[in-house]
Amino acid sequence: MVNFTVDQIRAIMDKKANIRNMSVIAHVDHGKSTLTDSLVCKAGIIASARAGETRFTDTRKDEQERCITIKSTAISLFYELSENDLNFIKQSKDGSGFLINLIDSPGHVDFSSEVTAALRVTDGALVVVDCVSGVCVQTETVLRQAIAERIKPVLMMNKMDRALLELQLEPEELYQTFQRIVENVNVIISTYGEGESGPMGNIMIDPVLGTVGFGSGLHGWAFTLKQFAEMYVAKFAAKGEGQLGPAERAKKVEDMMKKLWGDRYFDPATGKFSKSANSPDGKKLPRTFCQLILDPIFKVFDAIMNFKKEETAKLIEKLDIKLDSEDKDKEGKPLLKAVMRRWLPAGDALLQMITIHLPSPVTAQKYRCELLYEGPPDDEAAMGIKSCDPKGPLMMYISKMVPTSDKGRFYAFGRVFSGLVSTGLKVRIMGPNYTPGKKEDLYLKPIQRTILMMGRYVEPIEDVPCGNIVGLVGVDQFLVKTGTITTFEHAHNMRVMKFSVSPVVRVAVEAKNPADLPKLVEGLKRLAKSDPMVQCIIEESGEHIIAGAGELHLEICLKDLEEDHACIPIKKSDPVVSYRETVSEESNVLCLSKSPNKHNRLYMKARPFPDGLAEDIDKGEVSARQELKQRARYLAEKYEWDVAEARKIWCFGPDGTGPNILTDITKGVQYLNEIKDSVVAGFQWATKEGALCEENMRGVRFDVHDVTLHADAIHRGGGQIIPTARRCLYASVLTAQPRLMEPIYLVEIQCPEQVVGGIYGVLNRKRGHVFEETQVAGTPMFVVKAYLPVNESFGFTADLRSNTGGQAFPQCVFDHWQILPGDPFDNTSRPSQVVAETRKRKGLKEGIPALDNFLDKL
């Protein structure tokens, strides 16, 4: 099916029950791009001989060189199900042709923001797990994100060729390995999912249902239990009964699948299935999965890899595999690939699993609407999204910008959730800060062109109905990173994406030649557009700062900046880590600040959060948008807050959502509401730039104890109150034992047993500590988990490899913030050095400001 045209795709786009939007997610190097190849070659864009080597979706040169995926890439595939297979689909369908929009996403944790962007526009996910190394830290992170977005997972066990050829596992051991991975994945799903009673129903994966695939992307073969069940049903049917109708056949195959997994055994002597492991005459019976599925595969591997010519010929005939003339002369691995690919083609198995088990937009948008849309659940836009209605108002979410071949321009890449987007349509382009009824962050502009994304190429298309993924030309000037596009006047925004990592590593950049500064500024703007997570900031000292998730992420960003966006040579500083400011005790005095005109007084105290509250705010368990009483109850039950105080939270900060809280515990103050906005503004300002070195604050609760105000409104305006509030907040921080917090990575290291000692050495030198060490069952590999300060992580990978002879593979994920031990006021301590360096870098006055600047006497 190589030559399917845009018109054919366009025809299927209207059959929204036959669309599947899915992404491929996994831990780094578990083989996503390689697997995607077998799908692409099935839908016919790569020649099948090259599949497994081309990595079609790795479109950039550096992706091909480093052999990693950096940006998520979209591609549309067409697949036709046979009459027999259609009966397995439990949701509504429309004809036998399916359009699959597939997004291949990166596995490196540094690029997990790309994964988030991919997940937002898809409804299903193919989770790839390497069956040798099992479920890793990044598998868990991306799976958790997928479930939080209400995306249905199916599992693929990749790299079976390694299990057979390198580890030489027995069938029973291999079954146990699979069983363990399935259990691990289901534990993650049930931990973060909403249970069977939730809106999605049961999303646990189960080989019996056919939601688990097994195979090898590199060799291009794969199967689910369905393929083997069909072979055996056909075999048994051939013995006795005549032809079955498609519906009865589907029923028989489903029954058969139940027998092929779990504690079911097969007696080859009688040809019967049994539930006990021993036959009536006391022989030990083989498990059905091992006997009926793994055994034939092992036989093929054994015959071909040991060059048993006659046996190979017999097997090929028995399995009814038709080889090309050129394949017949091969031997060893090339022959193995050719045979397995003919017998169990990966494309078919995976595409069937995707079309049968992943939801169509019609199914998925019913339960995803409430998570996607911020507005009321019953306005026109929400109804359009829920029913995926092409006649409804246009609602579209742009999840990222894709650079075009033309420097400096971007395609806006996103998904149409309701309505129809077409060339020349006049739309409302709403950025993430838009609020209905206001004019800011809103543009009314026509769309210049709509295009289809096909991996490395784009195809122009007239219009695209809802449920599809599309690229737009001509809206990139009006959006940074993400936004909502709609034709409905009262539409609210689609919800902003939550990233699982935060940009904690920063680098200062400058142009080598000062005359190139304007190009650098322009380049930074483009960089901020092209990557969903990177932040570009200008410090007060005039420095340009780029913040990213980690070393690798920053390295790629800087390379892009130099070569694509700014096209000028760049100097960069050493990487610096962002810190947070916090307090460790309650303020020792009640802090008083007077306004500049001496007529208003504010009294406040600061105190630290109880453990875990800041993390809850980050996750969104406690947020500014929650229902008041519900939030108060949660705080009272979990953190033992006073209920009356918990109800009087004024706001969160910085930016209205951060992990600091301002509460009002005053008793009967007149005119208090009039100054609330001013105090809140001062609070946002103070929490964004803390007292120690103007870093964000974290985990501080401020209590307003008392306020005395001037009777005339004119003497208590914003100009009087905002700076006063800020001074008072600073004073309460400085009297509450202020501390610095540093970001900590969770490092997962895979290594053979003999080098574990070397790892401990490296970690101890870098202030890290190991908190878990486990052996991967059935292999000689160890997994070491440790906490490592981000500050010490630069060059960690190189250091680790040189100390372990290149046998250890680390994965760093940002995990939490931790207080840096020591007092910033003590000149010999580590925090005071950090404060001094940071203040110097930002061009602030030397030394922490004295308390007298903020605290007033009565």
From Swiss-Prot:
It catalyses: GTP + H2O = GDP + phosphate + H(+). The record marks E586, S587, K605, A606 as: Cleavage. Its main location: cytoplasm. Residues 17-362 form the tr-type G domain. The modification Diphthamide is found at H715. InterPro entries: EFG_II, EFG_III/V, EFG_V-like, EFTu-like_2, G_TR_CS, P-loop_NTPase, Ribosomal_Su5_D2-typ_SF, Ribsml_uS5_D2-typ_fold_subgr. There is a cross-link at K239 (Glycyl lysine isopeptide (Lys-Gly) (interchain with G-Cter in SUMO1)). Phosphorylation by EF-2 kinase completely inactivates EF-2; it requires prior phosphorylation by CDK2 at Ser-595 during mitotic prometaphase. Phosphorylation by CSK promotes SUMOylation, proteolytic cleavage, and nuclear translocation if the C-terminal fragment. Coiled coil: none annotated. Pfam families: EFG_C, EFG_III, EFG_IV, GTP_EFTU, GTP_EFTU_D2. One of its GO terms (biological process) is hematopoietic progenitor cell differentiation. The modification Phosphothreonine is found at T54, T57, T59, T435. The keyword Cell division does not apply. Its EC number is 3.6.5.-. The modification Phosphotyrosine is found at Y265, Y373. GTP binds at residues 26-33, 158-161, 216-218. The modification N6,N6,N6-trimethyllysine is found at K525. Catalyzes the GTP-dependent ribosomal translocation step during translation elongation. During this step, the ribosome changes from the pre-translocational (PRE) to the post-translocational (POST) state as the newly formed A-site-bound peptidyl-tRNA and P-site-bound deacylated tRNA move to the P and E sites, respectively. Catalyzes the coordinated movement of the two tRNA molecules, the mRNA and conformational changes in the ribosome. This is Elongation factor 2. The lineage of its organism: Eukaryota, Metazoa, Chordata, Craniata, Vertebrata.
